[in-house]
């Protein structure tokens, strides 16, 4: 009888702590074996999914409080009560709450939500200054002067852009912003359904313009979506201007949101048909001229290519725009 009475008092203390701090009880009802109810006085509504951000966050805060009271009472509290809040970005139905949740996490905490484990940190991506040591292209008359600082701000990387842990990756999108083929589809699949949900609110995007969203399950914090020109064959002057605008509009958003690193894919060179060599000239001119004005506001701009063909083009052309010797 004495033991049963002591257990009852301790359980009552835990229930009181959960009600004060909004914690769901470790059992569904007021006491084991009694009539069960679905929610506590201050907890989240019963209609909320267990994966819903509000439900998880409320549970996490309340559980911490219940655990603290349990320690003061000399009780070993139930392990699930002390678990941290977590949102499932694959199933949550509210992109706004998921976005707010992610913004409150540290970089280390965000890693738990990445779609991949083999992500690439920025510090692992060599700068052009380092890469150029292995480039044998000789440039008699470079288009621009040598600038050591700029050579440390630009990188050429061949690989999967969705795995780069940078502030933002740029998406070569179509005007609907709802996903498509190529890199666009890869980014949407990796980020998860919440990216498409947020993109639906942006109401399309014009050619040469850019819009920004959360990165969700990506290692990148943000995705900047831009729409390149469709140019099958020799591009016109207006199409070249639109391609340049894609990069500059994306960089404007980078500054606006105080982001310091970004990775760009090859925009318009896939199904949009822009010639790879001609695109590289536009891209390198835009990046060089932009960096000359804003080099202190960013840490790194990465040209991320997937095809060996594009890697060879940029390794050949970069010394003309970012000479190292």
Swiss-Prot record:
One of its GO terms (biological process) is purine nucleoside metabolic process. InterPro entries: Macro_dom, Macro_dom-like. It catalyses: 3''-O-acetyl-ADP-D-ribose + H2O = ADP-D-ribose + acetate + H(+); 2''-O-acetyl-ADP-D-ribose + H2O = ADP-D-ribose + acetate + H(+); 4-O-(ADP-D-ribosyl)-L-aspartyl-[protein] + H2O = L-aspartyl-[protein] + ADP-D-ribose + H(+); 5-O-(ADP-D-ribosyl)-L-glutamyl-[protein] + H2O = L-glutamyl-[protein] + ADP-D-ribose + H(+). There is a cross-link at residue 138 (Glycyl lysine isopeptide (Lys-Gly) (interchain with G-Cter in SUMO2)). It holds the Pfam family Macro. Residues 21-55 are annotated as: Disordered. One of its GO terms (cellular component) is nucleoplasm. Subject to competitive inhibition by the product ADP-ribose. Transmembrane segments: none annotated. Residues 141-322 form the Macro domain. SUPFAM superfamilies: Macro domain-like. Keywords: Acetylation, Hydrolase, Isopeptide bond, Nucleus, Ubl conjugation. Substrate binds at residues 159-161, 172-174, 179-184, 267-273, 306. The modification N6-succinyllysine is found at residues 96, 103, 129. Belongs to the MacroD-type family. MacroD1/2-like subfamily. This is ADP-ribose glycohydrolase MACROD1. It comes from Bos taurus (Bovine). The lineage of its organism: Eukaryota, Metazoa, Chordata, Craniata, Vertebrata.
């Amino acid at each position: 009888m004495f033991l049963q009475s002591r257990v009852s008092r301790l359980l009552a203390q835990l229930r009181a702590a959960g009600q004060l701090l909004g914690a769901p009880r470790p059992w569904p009802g007021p006491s084991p074996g009694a009539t069960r109810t679905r929610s506590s006085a201050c907890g989240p509504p019963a209609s909320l999914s267990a994966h819903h951000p509000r439900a998880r966050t409320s549970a996490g805060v309340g559980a911490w409080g219940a655990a603290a009271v349990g320690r003061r009472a000399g009780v070993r509290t139930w392990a699930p009560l002390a678990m941290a809040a977590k949102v499932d970005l694959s199933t949550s139905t509210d992109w706004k709450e998921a976005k707010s949740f992610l913004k409150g996490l540290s970089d280390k905490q965000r890693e738990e939500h990445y779609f991949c484990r083999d992500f690439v940190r920025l510090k692992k991506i060599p700068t052009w200054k380092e890469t150029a040591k292995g480039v044998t292209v000789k440039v008699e008359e470079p288009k621009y002067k040598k600038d050591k600082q700029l050579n440390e701000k630009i990188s050429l990387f061949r690989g999967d852009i969705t795995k780069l842990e940078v502030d933002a990756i740029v998406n070569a999108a179509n005007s609907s912003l709802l996903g498509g083929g190529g890199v666009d589809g890869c980014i949407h699949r990796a980020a998860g359904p919440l990216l498409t949900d947020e993109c639906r609110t942006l109401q399309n995007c014009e050619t040469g313009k850019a819009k920004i969203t959360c990165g969700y399950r990506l290692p990148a914090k943000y995705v900047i979506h831009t729409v390149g020109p469709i140019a099958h064959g020799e591009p016109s002057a207006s199409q070249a201007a639109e391609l340049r605008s894609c990069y500059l509009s994306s960089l404007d958003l980078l500054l606006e949101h105080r982001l310091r690193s970004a990775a760009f894919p090859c925009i318009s060179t896939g199904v949009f048909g822009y010639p790879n060599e001609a695109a590289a000239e536009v891209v390198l001119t835009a990046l060089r001229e932009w960096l000359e004005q804003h080099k202190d506001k960013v840490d790194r701009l990465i040209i991320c290519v997937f095809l060996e063909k594009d890697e060879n083009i940029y390794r050949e052309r970069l010394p003309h725009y970012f000479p190292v010797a």
